[in-house]
């Protein structure tokens, strides 16, 4: 997601994190804070299209799940303290929401890769999301025109799709996202 995560020197606590200015975007991995760069236009355009599709589906089903775009905090661990801001997440357990953040793993996460630091989405976040209980994780890479889907429930499966594909959202029975429509709309 972020092109240049810059680690800060000291470990931070939840209290220190909450004291940061609201306009400062930071993620914390194992107590180390990383500043996040601003996303690009294509990043935000993809985010908007996906959030719109996901939210429309959930509303049409009158479901309990909620869609949240970044910045919205997810505290995935207290020990070690880890808090992330996925580009898009879906939370189906309202008890995880406290008005300020999601406490625990969302059901579904999408990260949109920015060119400066793709390893963060492909490696570090995939590791954290798998280990802390995310059910499904998509990595949307506009530069490579690829979507990597990690299904962390049941038999672990990772599948790569092109932007020409229609992809099933497995946490729902009948939701499919046609990436060729998104690519055409955004001219990517």
Spell out what each predicted region is.
Residues 1-188:
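Gly/Pro/Ser/Thr-rich low-complexity, intrinsically disordered segments predominantly at protein N-termini
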């Amino acid at each position: 997601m972020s092109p240049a995560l810059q680690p800060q020197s000291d470990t931070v606590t939840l209290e220190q994190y909450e004291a940061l200015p609201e306009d400062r975007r930071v993620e914390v991995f194992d107590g180390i804070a990383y500043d996040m760069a601003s996303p690009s236009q294509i990043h935000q355009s993809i985010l908007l299209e996906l959030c719109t599709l996901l939210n429309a589906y959930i509303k049409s089903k009158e479901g309990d799940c909620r869609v949240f775009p970044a910045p919205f905090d997810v505290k995935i661990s207290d020990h070690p303290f880890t808090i992330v801001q996925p580009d898009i997440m879906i939370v189906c357990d309202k008890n995880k929401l406290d008005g300020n953040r999601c406490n625990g793993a969302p059901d579904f996460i999408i990260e949109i890769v920015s060119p400066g630091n793709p390893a963060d989405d492909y490696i570090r976040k995939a590791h954290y999301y798998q280990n802390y209980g995310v059910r499904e994780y998509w990595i949307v890479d506009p530069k490579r025109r690829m979507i990597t889907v990690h299904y962390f429930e049941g038999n672990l499966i990772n599948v790569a799709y092109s932007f020409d594909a229609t992809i099933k959202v497995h946490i729902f029975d009948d939701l499919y996202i046609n990436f060729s429509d998104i690519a055409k709309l955004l001219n990517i």
